[in-house]
């Protein structure tokens, strides 16, 4: 359901995985159901946006069309309940600081760790000033059920158009985000490339 919003032609159905004795079977009705798998159309990984960008094979018109498609999905996406905690100023701040904690655990060469600490301190000091804006966006309905993992490797050229796929299904907190944050992930990835 979630990924068909972005790529209805890529997602076929959900297959049952069963255990039949010592064997796992996909799509079988025999045995105990142990899991489910999403069945998708197989596409050429060379058509993923990261590979296309690397080869210089992306046209501005394609990116414009992708932006229009994502905006259309966002405009129809379910708004997150303001009482759910999704998109609350406290949660946005915590996610921001958690990202810095994860990055600080990486073995990065200097001056990156020093710069990350400076940026983290700035973000922590600036967060209280941004909290009213975050609250305003929450109340205005900009926190919605988004893609949640929108980056170049999760976009493919399929049937001559760029199409987002592989959105977050396993964790509602990662997909119930501000629509601006959803598109920002892809924008930053494109800018970095």
Predicted regions and their residues:
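Generic detector of contiguous secondary-structure segments
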Residues: 1-2, 108
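Structural motif at the C-terminus of the N-lobe alphaC helix and the adjacent alphaC-beta4 loop
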Residues: 2-9, 76-77, 190
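Generic hydrophobic/packing signal
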Residues: 3-7, 18, 42-47
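Conserved HxN/HPN-centered segment at the entrance to the catalytic loop
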Residues: 6-24
